[in-house]
Amino acid sequence: MSSSSDAIKAALEKGRAAGLSATGGKNADYIPFLASVPSDLFGLAVVTADGQTFKTGDADFAFAIESISKVFTLALVMEEIGPDSVREKVGADPTGLPFNSVIALELHNGKSLSPLVNAGAIATASLVPGDTADARWNNILECQCGFAGRRLKLSNEVNQSEQTTNFHNRAIAWLLYSAGTCYSDPMEAVDIYTRQCSTLVTATDLATMGATLAAGGVNPISGKRMVSAGNVAPILAEMTMEGLYTASGDWAYTVGLPGKSGVGGGIMAVVPGELAIAAFSPPLDPAGNSVKAMAAVAAVADSLGHNLYTTRGKVSS
C-alpha cells in the first residue's frame, strides 16, 4: 500500500505527538558518552523507497548508531560470503536473552545464534573482508556511508568511551574464539565492532538506510546498490527476530515491522517496498530501546496502515 505525501505528513505529526507524550526511561549510563546526551532530544523521519524525505523535530541531530550498525555489517558480510554461510558461521535464530548475554554461547557450543546480538555481531565483524583491521574498518564505514547516502564519521569521543568500558565484549570474543566461531583475532574483532557502533548518524540517515532495504537494496537517494535484492529478505528476517532485543517479539506482535534499535536512542523500521521510519530519543527502557522512539515509530506505522501481518483487501469468510 503506497502512502501519499499528505498521509506521511499527517502520520509524522501523530508520531511526534506519541513520541513526545511517552514517558519513562533513562539514558544508557554504562557508556559515559551516552549518559551525557541531552535526554529531551527527539527526532523522527520517514524516507520512501522512491527517495522522498519527511522529518520533524531533532531529526538531524547526530548521535551514536550503536547496535543499529549490526544490520549494515551483516549486509556487508552477507554480500561477501552469502546468507547460507552467515547462518552456518554466525547463526540465524533469536536468543530470547539480553543483547550482551553469554548464556546462549554456553548453551550452543560457542555459536552466537544471531548476528544482531553482541556475540553474533562480533563474530560477524570477524568475517568482514580486508587484510588488516583498518581495511576491515574502512569497508564497514564505506558500507554505512553508502546506505546513508552521505559521508559519515567515526566519533573518537564515542569510540574512546566505549573502548574503555567494553570488557564484557572482550570476554565474549574470547569465548567465541575458544569455540572456533570468531574468525579473526578476537581483540581485533572487538575493536572493529566497537568502532562500527561509534559512527554518528541522524534519524534522517537511519530512515535513508532503512529505505535502502525497503527499496530492495538500492539507496533511493543516490541510486547506488548496497546489497543484493536476494539478501534483503534474510536481513529483514533477522531484524524481526532480534532487532529490538528482548522486546522483539512484543514489537512484532504490536507493530509488525522489521526493526532495529540501538542504545544511542535510535530506532529504524522497514516497510518492504514502501518506506522506512526512524526516530531518536536517548532515554531507554529496561530492554535497551528508546521509549519515545518506539512510541513514535509505532504511531507512524499505525497511521499509515503498515503492519506486515495485517491482511488487506477482500477476504472470504
Curated annotation (Swiss-Prot):
InterPro entries, sorted: Beta-lactam/transpept-like (IPR012338), Glutaminase (IPR015868)
Reaction catalysis annotation: L-glutamine + H2O = L-glutamate + NH4(+)
SUPFAM superfamilies the record matches: beta-lactamase/transpeptidase-like
Binding site for substrate: 67, 118, 162, 169, 193, 245, 263
Domain of life: Bacteria
One BP term from GO: glutamate biosynthetic process
EC assignment: 3.5.1.2
Gene Ontology MF terms: glutaminase activity
Top enzyme category: hydrolase
Pfam families: Glutaminase (PF04960)
Assigned keywords, A-Z: Hydrolase
NCBIfam families registered for this protein in UniProt: Gln_ase, PRK12356.1
Oligomeric and partner information: Homotetramer.
UniProt similarity note: Belongs to the glutaminase family.
Entry protein name: Glutaminase
Organism of derivation: Brucella canis (strain ATCC 23365 / NCTC 10854 / RM-666)
Lineage, broadest ranks: Bacteria, Pseudomonadati, Pseudomonadota, Alphaproteobacteria, Hyphomicrobiales
